[in-house]
């Protein structure tokens, strides 16, 4: 799921849920005039963000573009902009961020495919097993 992140010092941050509680939902129009840092315009994540903003009825003021999602989080923590990132990057609470779900709970599904009729090495089979196990452990119980 994609999550809106804003600096904890932003006035809208007071609407965030307390730590340990499910995230509150934020209408992006509440921060429509704020600068944003988003993924590079050629990325899949940016395409999804552009669709989210279009559904919200505005185009964001993009202050920075990045190829690094963790970099987006760092820029938001520095209090100069807002961002949208996958939930994974917000799973550890931070006093510097306020995190919100978005209306409709947009998500980015990641899939891996491999031929079931072809040969898979022991290493490839082990990678599939470990990746599957890892992704199952990071799924949020409650966002």
Language-model segment annotations:
Residues 38, 59-68:
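Short beta-strand-to-loop elements that line the ligand-binding cleft
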Residues 7-11, 116-118:
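Short loop segments at secondary-structure junctions
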Residues 1, 23-26, 30, 70-119, ...:
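Beta-alpha-beta core module
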Residues 12-19:
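A short, charged helix-loop
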Residues 19-27, 34-56, 120-128, 135-143:
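Secondary-structure junction motif
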Residues 44, 66, 88:
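Residue-level "edge-of-site" marker
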